[in-house]
Protein backbone atom coordinates (compact mmCIF):
# COMPACT_ATOMS: atom_id res chain seq x y z
CA UNK A 1 0.00 0.00 0.00
CA UNK A 2 1.35 3.42 -0.95
CA UNK A 3 2.26 6.07 1.59
CA UNK A 4 -0.35 8.77 2.18
CA UNK A 5 2.42 11.37 2.29
CA UNK A 6 2.47 14.07 -0.38
CA UNK A 7 6.01 15.02 -1.34
CA UNK A 8 6.90 18.59 -2.29
CA UNK A 9 8.97 19.00 -5.45
CA UNK A 10 10.83 22.06 -6.70
CA UNK A 11 11.32 21.19 -10.37
CA UNK A 12 14.00 23.74 -11.21
CA UNK A 13 15.76 24.81 -14.38
CA UNK A 14 19.25 24.15 -13.00
CA UNK A 15 18.60 22.13 -9.85
CA UNK A 16 15.64 20.33 -8.32
CA UNK A 17 14.79 19.37 -4.75
CA UNK A 18 12.27 17.20 -2.93
CA UNK A 19 10.93 17.51 0.61
CA UNK A 20 8.44 15.80 2.87
CA UNK A 21 6.56 16.78 6.00
CA UNK A 22 7.77 15.04 9.17
CA UNK A 23 5.32 15.78 11.94
CA UNK A 24 4.65 19.46 11.34
CA UNK A 25 8.12 20.28 9.98
CA UNK A 26 9.13 20.09 6.30
CA UNK A 27 12.41 18.28 5.63
CA UNK A 28 14.60 18.19 2.52
CA UNK A 29 15.37 14.65 1.35
CA UNK A 30 19.01 14.18 0.33
CA UNK A 31 19.70 12.26 -2.88
CA UNK A 32 21.80 9.09 -3.12
CA UNK A 33 25.01 11.16 -3.34
CA UNK A 34 24.05 12.91 -0.10
CA UNK A 35 23.34 16.26 -1.78
CA UNK A 36 20.21 18.24 -0.88
CA UNK A 37 19.64 19.45 -4.44
CA UNK A 38 19.88 17.46 -7.67
CA UNK A 39 21.02 18.87 -11.03
CA UNK A 40 18.10 18.98 -13.50
CA UNK A 41 20.20 17.17 -16.10
CA UNK A 42 19.35 14.01 -18.07
CA UNK A 43 21.84 12.03 -20.14
CA UNK A 44 21.53 8.97 -22.37
CA UNK A 45 24.54 6.66 -22.52
CA UNK A 46 24.83 3.06 -23.77
CA UNK A 47 21.07 2.59 -23.57
CA UNK A 48 20.96 3.86 -19.98
CA UNK A 49 19.20 6.98 -18.72
CA UNK A 50 21.23 8.97 -16.21
CA UNK A 51 19.81 11.78 -14.08
CA UNK A 52 21.39 14.33 -11.76
CA UNK A 53 25.03 14.74 -10.80
CA UNK A 54 26.22 11.69 -12.75
CA UNK A 55 24.59 13.11 -15.91
CA UNK A 56 26.03 16.58 -15.31
CA UNK A 57 29.58 15.27 -14.73
CA UNK A 58 29.85 13.68 -18.16
CA UNK A 59 28.09 16.47 -20.08
CA UNK A 60 31.40 17.64 -21.60
CA UNK A 61 32.00 14.36 -23.42
CA UNK A 62 28.42 13.19 -23.98
CA UNK A 63 26.43 15.11 -26.61
CA UNK A 64 23.27 13.24 -25.54
CA UNK A 65 22.95 15.35 -22.40
CA UNK A 66 19.90 17.56 -21.80
CA UNK A 67 19.88 20.46 -19.34
CA UNK A 68 17.60 23.46 -18.61
CA UNK A 69 14.62 21.64 -20.20
CA UNK A 70 12.27 23.66 -17.98
CA UNK A 71 12.84 26.70 -20.21
CA UNK A 72 10.99 24.82 -23.00
CA UNK A 73 7.98 23.62 -20.98
CA UNK A 74 4.74 24.38 -22.80
CA UNK A 75 6.61 25.33 -25.98
CA UNK A 76 4.64 24.17 -29.02
CA UNK A 77 6.37 21.48 -31.05
CA UNK A 78 9.64 21.53 -29.08
CA UNK A 79 11.39 18.16 -28.94
CA UNK A 80 14.90 16.91 -28.20
CA UNK A 81 16.25 14.22 -30.51
CA UNK A 82 18.56 11.58 -29.03
CA UNK A 83 19.77 8.62 -31.09
CA UNK A 84 16.86 8.99 -33.49
CA UNK A 85 14.19 9.20 -30.77
CA UNK A 86 12.31 12.42 -29.97
CA UNK A 87 11.55 13.47 -26.39
CA UNK A 88 9.13 16.23 -25.34
CA UNK A 89 10.02 18.56 -22.44
CA UNK A 90 7.36 16.73 -20.41
CA UNK A 91 9.11 13.38 -20.92
CA UNK A 92 12.54 14.74 -19.97
CA UNK A 93 11.06 16.49 -16.92
CA UNK A 94 9.31 13.23 -16.00
CA UNK A 95 12.70 11.49 -15.91
CA UNK A 96 13.91 14.07 -13.37
CA UNK A 97 10.69 13.66 -11.36
CA UNK A 98 11.05 9.85 -11.42
CA UNK A 99 14.58 10.20 -10.06
CA UNK A 100 13.41 12.48 -7.23
CA UNK A 101 10.45 10.17 -6.53
CA UNK A 102 12.76 7.13 -6.31
CA UNK A 103 15.09 8.45 -3.62
CA UNK A 104 12.14 10.02 -1.75
CA UNK A 105 10.59 6.53 -1.62
CA UNK A 106 13.88 5.10 -0.32
CA UNK A 107 13.86 7.69 2.47
CA UNK A 108 10.18 7.32 3.36
CA UNK A 109 10.32 3.53 3.04
CA UNK A 110 7.13 3.31 1.03
CA UNK A 111 5.73 3.99 -2.44
CA UNK A 112 4.90 7.63 -3.13
CA UNK A 113 2.06 8.45 -5.51
CA UNK A 114 1.20 12.08 -4.76
CA UNK A 115 3.11 15.34 -5.10
CA UNK A 116 2.83 19.10 -4.98
CA UNK A 117 5.00 20.55 -7.76
CA UNK A 118 6.05 24.17 -7.95
CA UNK A 119 6.24 26.38 -11.03
CA UNK A 120 7.39 29.95 -11.63
CA UNK A 121 4.59 32.35 -10.71
CA UNK A 122 4.70 33.78 -14.22
CA UNK A 123 4.21 30.41 -15.94
CA UNK A 124 1.24 30.55 -18.31
CA UNK A 125 -1.49 27.94 -18.56
CA UNK A 126 0.34 25.85 -21.19
CA UNK A 127 3.48 25.69 -19.04
CA UNK A 128 1.46 24.69 -15.96
CA UNK A 129 -0.40 22.00 -17.87
CA UNK A 130 2.90 20.67 -19.25
CA UNK A 131 4.27 20.44 -15.69
CA UNK A 132 1.19 18.52 -14.58
CA UNK A 133 1.58 16.17 -17.56
CA UNK A 134 5.24 15.56 -16.62
CA UNK A 135 4.14 14.51 -13.14
CA UNK A 136 1.56 12.14 -14.58
CA UNK A 137 4.14 10.55 -16.92
CA UNK A 138 6.42 10.05 -13.89
CA UNK A 139 3.65 8.14 -12.10
CA UNK A 140 2.69 10.96 -9.76
CA UNK A 141 -0.75 12.34 -9.05
CA UNK A 142 -0.08 16.08 -8.96
CA UNK A 143 -2.33 17.22 -6.12
CA UNK A 144 -1.47 20.87 -6.57
CA UNK A 145 0.62 23.15 -8.76
CA UNK A 146 1.76 26.14 -6.69
CA UNK A 147 3.86 29.18 -7.49
CA UNK A 148 7.50 29.14 -6.40
CA UNK A 149 7.48 32.50 -4.55
CA UNK A 150 4.31 31.43 -2.72
CA UNK A 151 5.99 28.17 -1.70
CA UNK A 152 9.00 30.12 -0.40
CA UNK A 153 6.65 32.33 1.62
CA UNK A 154 4.97 29.21 3.07
CA UNK A 155 8.38 27.90 4.18
CA UNK A 156 9.22 31.28 5.72
CA UNK A 157 5.89 31.94 7.40
CA UNK A 158 4.94 28.50 8.73
CA UNK A 159 6.23 29.31 12.24
CA UNK A 160 5.23 32.99 12.12
CA UNK A 161 1.45 32.65 11.89
CA UNK A 162 0.86 35.06 14.77
CA UNK A 163 2.48 37.93 12.81
CA UNK A 164 0.83 40.25 10.30
CA UNK A 165 3.41 40.97 7.61
CA UNK A 166 3.57 42.15 4.04
CA UNK A 167 6.23 40.07 2.31
CA UNK A 168 7.99 40.54 -1.03
CA UNK A 169 9.53 37.36 -2.47
CA UNK A 170 12.26 37.97 -5.05
CA UNK A 171 12.87 34.63 -6.79
CA UNK A 172 15.77 34.45 -9.28
CA UNK A 173 16.44 30.86 -10.27
CA UNK A 174 18.47 29.17 -12.98
CA UNK A 175 16.15 30.07 -15.83
CA UNK A 176 13.19 32.04 -14.49
CA UNK A 177 12.51 35.16 -12.44
CA UNK A 178 9.44 35.89 -10.31
CA UNK A 179 8.46 38.45 -7.75
CA UNK A 180 5.38 38.10 -5.57
CA UNK A 181 3.87 40.29 -2.89
CA UNK A 182 1.96 38.50 -0.11
CA UNK A 183 0.13 39.40 3.04
CA UNK A 184 0.64 36.99 5.93
CA UNK A 185 -1.60 36.90 8.99
CA UNK A 186 -3.48 34.37 11.15
CA UNK A 187 -2.25 31.49 8.99
CA UNK A 188 -3.56 33.05 5.77
CA UNK A 189 -1.03 33.45 2.96
CA UNK A 190 -2.74 35.91 0.63
CA UNK A 191 -0.93 36.60 -2.65
CA UNK A 192 -1.62 40.22 -3.59
CA UNK A 193 0.28 40.30 -6.88
CA UNK A 194 2.88 38.53 -8.97
CA UNK A 195 5.13 39.46 -11.88
CA UNK A 196 8.22 38.17 -13.59
CA UNK A 197 10.08 36.89 -16.63
CA UNK A 198 10.06 33.18 -17.52
CA UNK A 199 13.24 33.55 -19.59
CA UNK A 200 15.64 35.24 -17.18
CA UNK A 201 17.86 33.50 -14.65
CA UNK A 202 21.27 32.25 -13.62
CA UNK A 203 21.87 30.69 -17.04
CA UNK A 204 21.89 34.21 -18.50
CA UNK A 205 24.55 35.31 -16.00
CA UNK A 206 26.66 32.28 -17.02
CA UNK A 207 26.19 33.20 -20.68
CA UNK A 208 27.56 36.72 -20.06
CA UNK A 209 30.78 35.23 -18.65
CA UNK A 210 30.97 32.74 -21.54
CA UNK A 211 30.57 35.50 -24.12
CA UNK A 212 33.33 37.50 -22.41
CA UNK A 213 35.67 34.48 -22.38
CA UNK A 214 34.93 33.62 -26.03
CA UNK A 215 35.54 37.22 -27.16
CA UNK A 216 38.79 37.48 -25.20
CA UNK A 217 40.11 34.15 -26.46
CA UNK A 218 39.27 35.03 -30.06
CA UNK A 219 41.06 38.36 -29.73
CA UNK A 220 44.17 36.75 -28.24
CA UNK A 221 44.36 33.57 -30.34
CA UNK A 222 42.15 34.10 -33.38
CA UNK A 223 40.10 31.01 -32.48
CA UNK A 224 36.30 31.14 -32.03
CA UNK A 225 35.43 28.75 -29.20
CA UNK A 226 31.69 29.24 -29.78
CA UNK A 227 31.98 26.86 -32.76
CA UNK A 228 33.37 24.04 -30.59
CA UNK A 229 30.66 22.10 -28.70
CA UNK A 230 33.04 20.45 -26.23
CA UNK A 231 34.83 23.73 -25.53
CA UNK A 232 31.46 25.43 -24.96
CA UNK A 233 30.47 22.86 -22.34
CA UNK A 234 33.79 23.39 -20.54
CA UNK A 235 33.26 27.16 -20.74
CA UNK A 236 29.74 26.81 -19.31
CA UNK A 237 30.99 24.76 -16.35
CA UNK A 238 33.83 27.23 -15.74
CA UNK A 239 31.48 30.23 -16.02
CA UNK A 240 29.03 28.73 -13.52
CA UNK A 241 31.87 28.00 -11.08
CA UNK A 242 33.32 31.52 -11.45
CA UNK A 243 29.88 33.04 -10.83
CA UNK A 244 29.50 31.03 -7.63
CA UNK A 245 33.06 31.82 -6.50
CA UNK A 246 32.45 35.55 -6.92
CA UNK A 247 29.69 35.39 -4.32
CA UNK A 248 32.42 34.74 -1.74
CA UNK A 249 35.62 36.26 -3.19
CA UNK A 250 36.37 39.40 -5.18
CA UNK A 251 38.30 37.63 -7.93
CA UNK A 252 37.88 34.22 -9.59
CA UNK A 253 40.51 32.32 -11.56
CA UNK A 254 39.38 30.57 -14.74
CA UNK A 255 41.83 27.94 -15.99
CA UNK A 256 41.00 25.70 -18.96
CA UNK A 257 44.11 23.95 -20.28
CA UNK A 258 44.05 22.46 -23.80
CA UNK A 259 40.79 24.25 -24.60
CA UNK A 260 41.71 24.33 -28.29
CA UNK A 261 44.59 23.97 -30.74
CA UNK A 262 46.36 26.45 -33.00
CA UNK A 263 49.03 26.21 -35.68
CA UNK A 264 51.77 26.00 -33.05
CA UNK A 265 50.11 23.42 -30.82
CA UNK A 266 47.63 23.36 -27.92
CA UNK A 267 46.00 26.54 -26.61
CA UNK A 268 45.11 27.19 -22.98
CA UNK A 269 42.62 29.64 -21.47
CA UNK A 270 43.79 31.46 -18.34
CA UNK A 271 41.71 34.40 -17.12
CA UNK A 272 41.00 36.33 -13.94
CA UNK A 273 37.47 37.66 -13.50
CA UNK A 274 36.97 40.31 -10.85
CA UNK A 275 33.63 40.81 -9.12
CA UNK A 276 33.60 44.38 -10.46
CA UNK A 277 33.95 43.12 -14.05
CA UNK A 278 31.26 40.48 -13.45
CA UNK A 279 28.93 43.18 -12.12
CA UNK A 280 29.64 45.26 -15.22
CA UNK A 281 28.93 42.32 -17.55
CA UNK A 282 25.63 41.45 -15.86
CA UNK A 283 24.33 44.90 -14.85
CA UNK A 284 21.63 44.82 -17.54
CA UNK A 285 20.33 41.46 -16.25
CA UNK A 286 20.02 42.77 -12.69
CA UNK A 287 18.30 45.89 -14.02
CA UNK A 288 15.81 43.73 -15.97
CA UNK A 289 14.44 42.46 -12.65
CA UNK A 290 13.64 45.97 -11.38
CA UNK A 291 10.55 46.59 -13.55
CA UNK A 292 8.75 43.40 -12.39
CA UNK A 293 9.46 44.40 -8.76
CA UNK A 294 7.92 47.83 -9.36
CA UNK A 295 4.94 46.34 -11.22
CA UNK A 296 4.26 43.81 -8.46
CA UNK A 297 4.23 46.58 -5.85
CA UNK A 298 1.99 48.72 -8.05
CA UNK A 299 -0.48 45.85 -8.65
CA UNK A 300 -0.59 45.19 -4.90
CA UNK A 301 -1.30 48.90 -4.38
CA UNK A 302 1.72 49.19 -2.08
CA UNK A 303 4.86 51.30 -1.78
CA UNK A 304 8.27 49.75 -1.10
CA UNK A 305 8.08 51.26 2.39
CA UNK A 306 4.94 49.16 3.11
CA UNK A 307 6.92 45.91 2.79
CA UNK A 308 7.91 44.36 6.14
CA UNK A 309 10.08 41.47 4.92
CA UNK A 310 12.02 40.76 1.73
CA UNK A 311 12.74 37.08 1.05
CA UNK A 312 15.35 36.04 -1.51
CA UNK A 313 14.81 32.72 -3.22
CA UNK A 314 16.73 30.87 -5.93
CA UNK A 315 20.47 30.23 -6.14
CA UNK A 316 21.11 33.33 -8.25
CA UNK A 317 20.09 35.59 -5.34
CA UNK A 318 23.48 34.74 -3.79
CA UNK A 319 25.05 37.17 -6.30
CA UNK A 320 26.11 40.21 -4.21
CA UNK A 321 25.01 42.72 -6.90
CA UNK A 322 21.51 41.19 -6.88
CA UNK A 323 21.27 41.47 -3.09
CA UNK A 324 22.47 45.08 -3.19
CA UNK A 325 19.96 45.96 -5.92
CA UNK A 326 17.01 44.45 -4.04
CA UNK A 327 18.08 46.25 -0.87
CA UNK A 328 18.31 49.51 -2.83
CA UNK A 329 14.88 49.13 -4.46
CA UNK A 330 12.99 48.04 -1.34
CA UNK A 331 14.93 49.84 1.37
CA UNK A 332 15.01 46.56 3.31
CA UNK A 333 17.88 44.23 4.19
CA UNK A 334 16.84 40.86 2.69
CA UNK A 335 15.87 38.13 5.14
CA UNK A 336 18.35 35.23 5.04
CA UNK A 337 16.55 32.88 7.44
CA UNK A 338 15.69 30.32 4.73
CA UNK A 339 18.03 28.56 2.31
CA UNK A 340 17.31 29.98 -1.17
CA UNK A 341 17.99 26.59 -2.77
CA UNK A 342 15.61 24.68 -0.50
CA UNK A 343 12.77 27.05 0.43
CA UNK A 344 10.53 26.21 -2.53
CA UNK A 345 10.60 22.43 -1.99
CA UNK A 346 10.01 22.94 1.74
CA UNK A 347 7.01 25.17 1.00
CA UNK A 348 5.64 22.59 -1.44
CA UNK A 349 5.88 19.96 1.32
CA UNK A 350 3.96 22.31 3.64
CA UNK A 351 1.22 22.63 1.01
CA UNK A 352 1.18 18.82 0.80
CA UNK A 353 0.62 18.79 4.56
CA UNK A 354 -2.23 21.30 4.20
CA UNK A 355 -3.91 18.96 1.67
CA UNK A 356 -3.53 15.85 3.88
CA UNK A 357 -4.65 17.77 6.97
CA UNK A 358 -1.30 17.38 8.77
CA UNK A 359 -0.82 21.17 8.72
CA UNK A 360 -3.69 22.99 10.41
CA UNK A 361 -4.85 26.59 10.19
CA UNK A 362 -2.94 27.46 7.01
CA UNK A 363 -4.85 28.90 4.06
CA UNK A 364 -3.13 29.68 0.77
CA UNK A 365 -4.78 32.23 -1.53
CA UNK A 366 -2.83 32.33 -4.79
CA UNK A 367 -3.45 34.38 -7.93
CA UNK A 368 -3.48 33.97 -11.69
CA UNK A 369 -0.37 35.70 -13.10
CA UNK A 370 -1.83 36.83 -16.44
CA UNK A 371 -5.19 38.11 -17.67
CA UNK A 372 -7.51 35.70 -19.51
CA UNK A 373 -10.05 36.43 -22.21
CA UNK A 374 -11.18 35.88 -25.79
CA UNK A 375 -10.74 37.49 -29.18
CA UNK A 376 -13.66 39.71 -30.22
CA UNK A 377 -14.48 41.74 -33.33
CA UNK A 378 -11.55 43.50 -34.95
CA UNK A 379 -8.97 41.22 -33.34
CA UNK A 380 -9.42 42.85 -29.93
CA UNK A 381 -8.45 40.97 -26.74
CA UNK A 382 -11.42 41.18 -24.36
CA UNK A 383 -10.42 40.26 -20.79
CA UNK A 384 -12.75 38.22 -18.61
CA UNK A 385 -10.37 37.62 -15.70
CA UNK A 386 -7.73 40.19 -14.80
CA UNK A 387 -4.23 39.25 -13.71
CA UNK A 388 -3.63 38.84 -9.96
CA UNK A 389 -7.20 37.60 -9.41
CA UNK A 390 -7.32 35.16 -6.48
CA UNK A 391 -7.86 31.56 -7.60
CA UNK A 392 -9.88 29.41 -7.86
CA UNK A 393 -12.28 31.75 -9.64
CA UNK A 394 -15.03 31.85 -12.27
CA UNK A 395 -16.22 34.71 -14.48
CA UNK A 396 -18.92 34.90 -17.17
CA UNK A 397 -19.73 37.46 -19.84
CA UNK A 398 -22.38 37.50 -22.58
CA UNK A 399 -21.36 38.06 -26.21
CA UNK A 400 -23.30 37.93 -29.48
CA UNK A 401 -22.85 37.20 -33.17
CA UNK A 402 -21.06 39.53 -35.59
CA UNK A 403 -23.18 38.72 -38.68
CA UNK A 404 -26.80 38.00 -39.56
CA UNK A 405 -27.82 34.32 -39.42
CA UNK A 406 -24.39 33.31 -38.11
CA UNK A 407 -24.64 29.53 -37.44
CA UNK A 408 -21.53 29.19 -35.26
CA UNK A 409 -19.07 31.20 -33.19
CA UNK A 410 -15.35 30.49 -32.86
CA UNK A 411 -14.01 31.01 -29.36
CA UNK A 412 -10.32 31.97 -29.38
CA UNK A 413 -9.01 31.72 -25.80
CA UNK A 414 -6.04 33.95 -24.92
CA UNK A 415 -3.77 34.84 -22.01
CA UNK A 416 -1.77 38.06 -21.69
CA UNK A 417 -1.88 41.81 -21.15
CA UNK A 418 -1.73 43.32 -24.67
CA UNK A 419 -4.87 44.99 -26.13
CA UNK A 420 -4.77 43.10 -29.45
CA UNK A 421 -5.40 39.35 -29.60
CA UNK A 422 -2.47 38.66 -31.96
CA UNK A 423 0.00 39.96 -29.36
CA UNK A 424 -1.11 37.55 -26.63
CA UNK A 425 -0.63 33.84 -25.96
CA UNK A 426 -3.19 31.51 -27.59
CA UNK A 427 -4.38 28.88 -25.13
CA UNK A 428 -6.90 27.17 -27.37
CA UNK A 429 -9.76 27.38 -29.87
CA UNK A 430 -13.18 25.77 -29.91
CA UNK A 431 -16.51 26.28 -31.68
CA UNK A 432 -20.12 26.61 -30.56
CA UNK A 433 -22.32 25.42 -33.45
CA UNK A 434 -26.03 25.13 -34.35
CA UNK A 435 -26.92 28.69 -33.36
CA UNK A 436 -30.47 29.37 -34.68
CA UNK A 437 -30.69 31.88 -37.54
CA UNK A 438 -31.11 35.38 -36.13
CA UNK A 439 -30.06 38.94 -36.90
CA UNK A 440 -26.62 40.06 -35.83
CA UNK A 441 -26.45 40.90 -32.10
CA UNK A 442 -29.56 38.91 -31.13
CA UNK A 443 -28.13 35.52 -30.01
CA UNK A 444 -26.87 35.54 -26.43
CA UNK A 445 -23.63 33.55 -26.05
CA UNK A 446 -22.42 33.26 -22.46
CA UNK A 447 -18.68 32.62 -22.19
CA UNK A 448 -17.47 31.35 -18.80
CA UNK A 449 -13.87 31.07 -17.61
CA UNK A 450 -13.03 28.78 -14.68
CA UNK A 451 -9.55 28.68 -13.16
CA UNK A 452 -8.94 25.86 -10.70
CA UNK A 453 -6.61 25.84 -7.68
CA UNK A 454 -3.70 24.79 -9.93
CA UNK A 455 -4.19 27.73 -12.26
CA UNK A 456 -5.49 25.40 -15.01
CA UNK A 457 -8.14 27.01 -17.25
CA UNK A 458 -11.53 25.64 -18.33
CA UNK A 459 -13.70 27.61 -20.76
CA UNK A 460 -17.32 27.07 -21.79
CA UNK A 461 -19.63 28.80 -24.27
CA UNK A 462 -23.41 28.48 -23.92
CA UNK A 463 -26.20 29.61 -26.25
CA UNK A 464 -28.69 31.11 -23.79
CA UNK A 465 -31.55 30.57 -26.26
CA UNK A 466 -31.07 26.83 -26.82
CA UNK A 467 -28.97 25.97 -23.74
CA UNK A 468 -26.52 24.23 -26.08
CA UNK A 469 -23.07 24.28 -24.49
CA UNK A 470 -19.50 23.56 -25.58
CA UNK A 471 -16.57 23.23 -23.14
CA UNK A 472 -12.80 23.07 -23.41
CA UNK A 473 -10.09 22.29 -20.88
CA UNK A 474 -6.99 24.11 -22.03
CA UNK A 475 -4.23 21.62 -22.79
CA UNK A 476 -0.55 22.48 -22.99
CA UNK A 477 0.44 23.94 -26.33
CA UNK A 478 2.35 20.71 -26.99
CA UNK A 479 -1.15 19.30 -27.36
CA UNK A 480 -0.45 16.03 -25.55
CA UNK A 481 -3.59 13.92 -25.63
CA UNK A 482 -4.56 11.55 -22.82
CA UNK A 483 -3.47 8.67 -25.07
CA UNK A 484 -0.05 10.25 -25.62
CA UNK A 485 0.39 10.84 -21.90
CA UNK A 486 -0.66 7.23 -21.22
CA UNK A 487 1.89 5.99 -23.77
CA UNK A 488 4.62 8.14 -22.22
CA UNK A 489 3.68 6.87 -18.75
CA UNK A 490 4.08 3.29 -19.95
CA UNK A 491 7.42 4.12 -21.57
CA UNK A 492 8.58 5.76 -18.35
CA UNK A 493 7.59 2.64 -16.38
CA UNK A 494 9.38 0.42 -18.89
CA UNK A 495 12.49 2.58 -18.62
CA UNK A 496 12.26 2.40 -14.85
CA UNK A 497 12.03 -1.40 -15.04
CA UNK A 498 14.90 -1.51 -17.54
CA UNK A 499 17.02 0.70 -15.30
CA UNK A 500 16.26 -1.54 -12.31
CA UNK A 501 17.16 -4.63 -14.33
CA UNK A 502 20.38 -3.00 -15.54
CA UNK A 503 21.30 -2.08 -11.97
CA UNK A 504 20.54 -5.63 -10.85
CA UNK A 505 22.86 -6.93 -13.58
CA UNK A 506 25.66 -4.59 -12.53
CA UNK A 507 25.19 -5.49 -8.84
CA UNK A 508 25.26 -9.21 -9.64
CA UNK A 509 28.43 -8.87 -11.74
CA UNK A 510 30.11 -6.88 -8.99
CA UNK A 511 29.11 -9.50 -6.41
CA UNK A 512 30.51 -12.25 -8.66
CA UNK A 513 33.83 -10.41 -9.05
CA UNK A 514 34.04 -9.94 -5.29
CA UNK A 515 33.17 -13.59 -4.61
CA UNK A 516 35.80 -14.89 -7.06
CA UNK A 517 38.44 -12.72 -5.40
CA UNK A 518 37.33 -13.89 -1.95
CA UNK A 519 37.35 -17.53 -3.10
CA UNK A 520 40.98 -17.40 -4.30
CA UNK A 521 41.99 -15.78 -1.01
CA UNK A 522 40.12 -18.37 1.08
CA UNK A 523 41.57 -21.30 -0.90
CA UNK A 524 45.09 -20.01 -0.15
CA UNK A 525 44.25 -19.71 3.55
CA UNK A 526 42.80 -23.24 3.86
CA UNK A 527 45.51 -25.02 1.87
CA UNK A 528 46.85 -27.88 4.01
CA UNK A 529 44.15 -27.31 6.61
CA UNK A 530 41.20 -29.04 4.91
CA UNK A 531 40.95 -32.10 2.70
CA UNK A 532 41.88 -32.06 -0.99
CA UNK A 533 38.32 -33.12 -1.84
CA UNK A 534 36.91 -30.00 -0.19
CA UNK A 535 39.38 -27.76 -2.02
CA UNK A 536 38.55 -29.51 -5.32
CA UNK A 537 34.82 -28.96 -4.70
CA UNK A 538 35.40 -25.22 -4.16
CA UNK A 539 37.63 -24.94 -7.25
CA UNK A 540 35.02 -26.69 -9.42
CA UNK A 541 32.28 -24.33 -8.16
CA UNK A 542 34.57 -21.34 -8.79
CA UNK A 543 35.33 -22.47 -12.36
CA UNK A 544 31.61 -23.02 -13.03
CA UNK A 545 30.88 -19.47 -11.88
CA UNK A 546 33.68 -18.11 -14.09
CA UNK A 547 32.18 -19.93 -17.07
CA UNK A 548 28.74 -18.40 -16.37
CA UNK A 549 30.42 -15.00 -16.04
CA UNK A 550 32.17 -15.36 -19.41
CA UNK A 551 28.86 -16.39 -21.02
CA UNK A 552 27.21 -13.33 -19.40
CA UNK A 553 24.30 -15.55 -18.34
CA UNK A 554 22.73 -13.64 -15.45
CA UNK A 555 20.44 -16.41 -14.15
CA UNK A 556 23.26 -18.96 -14.31
CA UNK A 557 25.59 -16.50 -12.57
CA UNK A 558 23.09 -16.06 -9.72
CA UNK A 559 22.68 -19.82 -9.25
CA UNK A 560 26.43 -20.57 -9.42
CA UNK A 561 27.15 -17.61 -7.12
CA UNK A 562 24.80 -19.03 -4.48
CA UNK A 563 26.44 -22.49 -4.79
CA UNK A 564 29.97 -21.11 -4.41
CA UNK A 565 28.96 -18.79 -1.57
CA UNK A 566 27.71 -21.75 0.50
CA UNK A 567 30.89 -23.79 -0.14
CA UNK A 568 33.19 -20.89 0.78
CA UNK A 569 31.14 -20.14 3.89
CA UNK A 570 31.52 -23.78 5.02
CA UNK A 571 35.28 -23.64 4.43
CA UNK A 572 35.56 -20.36 6.32
CA UNK A 573 33.64 -21.84 9.27
CA UNK A 574 36.02 -24.84 9.37
CA UNK A 575 39.04 -22.55 9.21
CA UNK A 576 37.65 -20.44 12.03
CA UNK A 577 36.84 -23.49 14.19
CA UNK A 578 40.33 -24.88 13.59
CA UNK A 579 41.91 -21.56 14.60
CA UNK A 580 39.79 -21.52 17.77
CA UNK A 581 40.81 -25.08 18.61
CA UNK A 582 44.51 -24.28 18.18
CA UNK A 583 44.13 -21.17 20.28
CA UNK A 584 42.46 -23.25 22.99
CA UNK A 585 45.34 -25.79 23.06
CA UNK A 586 47.85 -22.94 23.22
CA UNK A 587 46.04 -21.35 26.15
CA UNK A 588 46.03 -24.63 28.06
CA UNK A 589 49.78 -25.07 27.56
CA UNK A 590 50.33 -21.48 28.58
CA UNK A 591 48.36 -22.02 31.77
CA UNK A 592 50.53 -25.04 32.77
CA UNK A 593 53.68 -23.03 32.14
CA UNK A 594 52.40 -20.19 34.25
CA UNK A 595 51.78 -22.55 37.19
CA UNK A 596 55.32 -23.95 36.96
CA UNK A 597 56.77 -20.45 36.90
CA UNK A 598 54.75 -19.55 39.94
CA UNK A 599 56.22 -22.53 41.84
CA UNK A 600 59.73 -21.31 41.09
CA UNK A 601 59.00 -17.72 41.99
CA UNK A 602 60.05 -17.89 45.68
CA UNK A 603 63.58 -19.08 44.80
CA UNK A 604 64.50 -15.83 43.12
CA UNK A 605 62.29 -13.31 44.85
CA UNK A 606 63.97 -10.32 46.56
CA UNK A 607 61.88 -8.38 49.05
CA UNK A 608 62.57 -4.66 49.18
CA UNK A 609 61.94 -2.04 51.87
CA UNK A 610 60.31 1.25 50.93
CA UNK A 611 59.36 4.46 52.69
CA UNK A 612 57.05 7.30 51.67
CA UNK A 613 58.73 10.54 50.63
CA UNK A 614 56.95 13.75 51.49
CA UNK A 615 57.75 16.59 49.06
CA UNK A 616 57.41 19.09 51.88
CA UNK A 617 60.44 17.52 53.57
CA UNK A 618 62.61 18.60 50.63
CA UNK A 619 61.78 22.26 50.94
Curated annotation (Swiss-Prot):
Record region (Disordered): 579-619
Residue spans of biased composition, Low complexity class: 583-596
Disulfide bonds: none
Induction description: By stress conditions e.g. heat shock.
Annotated positions of the Phosphothreonine modification: 176
Keyword Flavoprotein tagged: no
Keywords assigned: ATP-binding, Chaperone, Nucleotide-binding, Phosphoprotein, Stress response
Biased amino acid composition, Basic and acidic residues: 597-619
GO molecular function, one term: ATP-dependent protein folding chaperone
Keyword Lipoprotein part of the UniProt annotation: no
One of the Pfam families matching this protein, by short name: HSP70
Family: Belongs to the heat shock protein 70 family.
Its biological purpose: Acts as a chaperone.
Stored PANTHER family: HEAT SHOCK PROTEIN 70KDA (PTHR19375)
UniProt name for this protein: Chaperone protein DnaK
Organism annotation: Levilactobacillus brevis (strain ATCC 367 / BCRC 12310 / CIP 105137 / JCM 1170 / LMG 11437 / NCIMB 947 / NCTC 947) (Lactobacillus brevis)
Amino acid sequence: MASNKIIGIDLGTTNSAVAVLEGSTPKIIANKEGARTTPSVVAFKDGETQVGEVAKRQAITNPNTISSIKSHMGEAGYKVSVDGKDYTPQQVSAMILQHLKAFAEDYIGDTVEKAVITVPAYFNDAQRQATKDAGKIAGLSVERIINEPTAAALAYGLDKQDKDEKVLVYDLGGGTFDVSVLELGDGVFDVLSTNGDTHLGGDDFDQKIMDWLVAGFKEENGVDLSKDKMALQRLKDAAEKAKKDLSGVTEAQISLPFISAGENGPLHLEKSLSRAKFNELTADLVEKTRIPVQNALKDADLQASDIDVVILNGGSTRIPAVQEAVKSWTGKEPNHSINPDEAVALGAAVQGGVITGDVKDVVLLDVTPLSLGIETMGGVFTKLIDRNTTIPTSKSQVFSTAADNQPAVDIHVLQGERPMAADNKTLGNFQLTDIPAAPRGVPQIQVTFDIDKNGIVNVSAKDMGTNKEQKITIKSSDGLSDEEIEKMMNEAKENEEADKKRKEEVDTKNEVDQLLFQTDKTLKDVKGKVSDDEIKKAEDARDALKKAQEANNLDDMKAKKDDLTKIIQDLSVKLYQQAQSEAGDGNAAGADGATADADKKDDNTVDGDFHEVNDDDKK
